[in-house]
Every structure is written in C-alpha cells, then in structure tokens.
C-alpha cells in the first residue's frame, strides 16, 4: 500500500486562513440618518414630559356696531409623556477563552473584541428594527404557521409583513397572541437557522400558533412586550396601531393622528399621482408643515424607478443629500423631498415624514455600564466575566399630523 493522506493523517497539518469574515448584513443607513437629523433631548429623571398647543383662543367673530364684544377664548394646551425604554445587551466570556483567543496565534480573532463588537452591532440593529419597523410593542414578525421545527412567518404579499427579515440566527424569541395581555405561547425558543425569507428553524414542539406575534426574548418567563423604543409604525399612525400615544388618546386628540392615504388593505400599484397626493396631504389636511423626507422599503423605490424610466418628465437621478447620503428626490410644488430606503422600513408603505417634529429623548447614550469604574464584572462565583452594553432612550414626536402615510402599495409592478 502506498503512503497517502490517509496513512499520514496524523502527520499533516491543516492550514487556516487568517481573520474572521462577517456574514451578517449590518447595513442600516436610515436609522443612522434618523439619529443624526432628529433633535436630541438629554435629561435626568424618570420620564420626559412636554407640552403642545392643540387649540387657538377662539374668542372672536363679526359683530354689528355697538354690539357686545365676543366672549374671550383660551389657548388649549396638553401635556404628553414619553417614558424611557431600557435596552441592554450582555457579553459573557470565561477566563480561559479570553486567554486562549487573545492573539492570532491561538484564534482567528480576539474573542473579547469579537463579542463586544457583536453586542454593539446587535444593539444598533435592534434600535433600527424597532425604530423603523416597530410600533413600540417589540413585535418583529407574525406567525403564518408552525410545523415540526419550521416556523413560517407572514410575508409578502400579506400587507405590512416582512417575513423572517427581522429575525436572526442565535436569537431567542417568544410568541404571544397579542401585543399586550394574554399568555405566552412559545417561551424563549432558540432560532438555529434562517433558511429563507419566510422561515426560521426552531425546536420541535416549540408551541408557536398561527397569527401569534413574535418578540425578541430576554429570558424564559420574562414578558418582553412594550419595553422597546417607539418606532415609525406607532408615530406615523392614525390610531389604527397605537391608540394611546405618549399618554394621550388619539381619538380625543386628533392632532396626534397622521394623515393616511390607504386602500382598505388591498394592495395597489405605485403611481406618481399617489406620490404627489401624499406629498401635499400634510399641507392640505394636516398641521401645515411639509414632510422633509420620504421613507420606504427598497422594493417600492425599485418599482418607482422601473415605472419612471420611460417617463422623462420625472427626475430619479441619484443625488448627494444632507450628511453625504446618496438617494433620489421627489419634486413637489413646495420643494424637493429626499427619498430614502431601508430594509427595515414598513412593507407596503411610503411614509412622508416631517423629521422636524421627531425627537430622541436620551437618558443614557450607548455605552458600557461602568458606574463603579469597571466594565467587566464577575458573576455567579465562576471564573467568567460579563460586560453590559446599554442605552436608555425613546423616540417621540411633538406632533403627528405633519406626517403622511401612503399605504397598501404593492412591492411588484
């Protein structure tokens, strides 16, 4: 028998390429813009309270000569409250792995840097998902069906559904029948793979039920609902999703309703006429301000570009916008409005947002918990250490009626 690789298996070495490539899509341009252009309010305290004028003093009118003057009116002012949301992300390493994976000799990458960068990226991604897609409840998907180890999520062409886009490998999730109240259906289940844009692999007998809402889980038996930052689904809303907004009812405070141009839940094709109507809706029926930006999923912007390539009366050329972002603009009688896309934007919607009315209340910016001067801390009487990355914040709005939501737009031509 000749000498070959089988007989010399114990003698030959494996050769490893250096470095650790990242296969995770970390692109989240729109939330980065939202953080830059939104007014930031830094404060100390339990919650953020602010006032808004929702009515003028209506003490006036025409009178005849020598008649009694009109009865004086008064300005109407309401107080709104924005509670803080506390986001935490934990990295935990044993002393042995920190030592073994501290150089190129022992590992592909430094374990400490890999884990700390990982939780920072995950925090930023969760803020983007909840800020752009969410409504403050923390729901990131809806269950279509569940069989064996396959969890199927609602996706296009179901209105407003993103499939498995907001889920991640190694994420723990829970499912609930509602966004508040009720009991948990599937508690703290691990996602081991994302095989497609509409499915996730979970344990068998996990307990998911059709039409459940899916939430990121922070631990078994811990209710994760309504503990994350508010998102555009809750702000650019007329009360259909979030009825009580910033501690006020949208029913009795219509100024907290955005303008909605929908089609009763039936998908329709994107057209320039719909865009023009939405661009002017705030001036006609809202608070009078013009939207400063347009947010939509990339699929709708692609449909618009395909539609307009044959119509030279519209300009869909790429422009450099504020902050160095590349994008297109939509021309209205008032001004040109930059149009941005993001994979986390709400499906089937084109939102015309008055960014001036948004604000970001921050009690603790993104950083590691080191109040006692230490970033790493020992836990559980083990030779293991943890680092806690955190931010205490929430996204709010001083008004909502300057936003317009163009809804029920198909992702296909």
Q: Which residues make up each language-model segment?
A:
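Helix-start/capping segments and mature chain N-termini
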Residues: 67-72
């Amino acid at each position: 028998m000749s000498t070959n690789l089988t007989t010399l298996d114990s003698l030959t070495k494996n050769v490893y390429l250096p470095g650790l490539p990242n296969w995770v899509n970390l692109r989240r341009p729109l939330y980065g813009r939202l953080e830059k252009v939104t007014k930031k309010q830094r404060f100390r305290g339990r919650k953020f309270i602010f006032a808004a004028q929702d009515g003028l003093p209506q003490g006036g009118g025409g009178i005849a000569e020598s008649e009694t003057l009109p009865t004086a009116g008064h300005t109407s002012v309401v107080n709104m409250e924005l509670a803080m949301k506390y986001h935490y992300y934990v990295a935990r390493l044993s002393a042995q792995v920190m030592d073994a994976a501290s150089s190129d000799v022992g590992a592909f990458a430094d374990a400490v840097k890999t884990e700390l960068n990982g939780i920072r990226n995950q925090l930023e991604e969760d803020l983007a998902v909840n800020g752009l897609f969410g409504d403050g409840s923390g729901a990131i998907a809806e269950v279509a069906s569940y069989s064996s180890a396959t969890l199927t999520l609602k996706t296009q062409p179901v209105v407003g559904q993103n499939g498995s886009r907001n889920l991640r490998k190694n994420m723990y999730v829970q499912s609930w029948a509602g966004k508040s109240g009720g009991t948990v259906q599937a508690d703290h289940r691990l996602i081991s793979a994302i095989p497609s844009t509409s499915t996730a692999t979970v344990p068998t007998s996990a307990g998911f039920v059709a039409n459940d809402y899916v939430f990121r889980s922070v631990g078994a038996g811990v209710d994760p609902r309504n503990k994350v930052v508010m998102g555009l689904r809750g702000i650019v809303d007329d009360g259909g999703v979030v009825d009580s907004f910033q501690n006020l009812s949208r029913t009795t405070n219509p100024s907290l309703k955005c303008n909605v141009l929908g089609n009763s839940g039936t998908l329709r094709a994107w057209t320039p006429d719909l865009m023009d109507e939405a661009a002017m809706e705030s001036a006609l029926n809202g608070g009078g301000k013009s939207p400063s930006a347009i947010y939509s999923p990339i699929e709708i912007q692609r449909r618009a570009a395909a539609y307009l390539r044959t119509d030279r009366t519209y300009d869909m050329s790429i422009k450099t916008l504020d902050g160095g972002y590349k994008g297109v603009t939509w021309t209205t009688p008032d001004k040109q409005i930059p149009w941005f896309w993001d994979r986390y934007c709400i499906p089937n919607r084109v939102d015309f947002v008055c960014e001036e009315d948004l604000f970001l209340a921050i009690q603790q910016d993104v950083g590691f918990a080191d109040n006692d001067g230490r970033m790493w801390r020992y836990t559980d009487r083990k030779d293991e250490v943890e680092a806690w990355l955190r931010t205490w914040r929430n996204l709010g709005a001083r008004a909502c009626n300057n936003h317009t939501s163009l809804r029920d737009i198909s992702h296909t031509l």
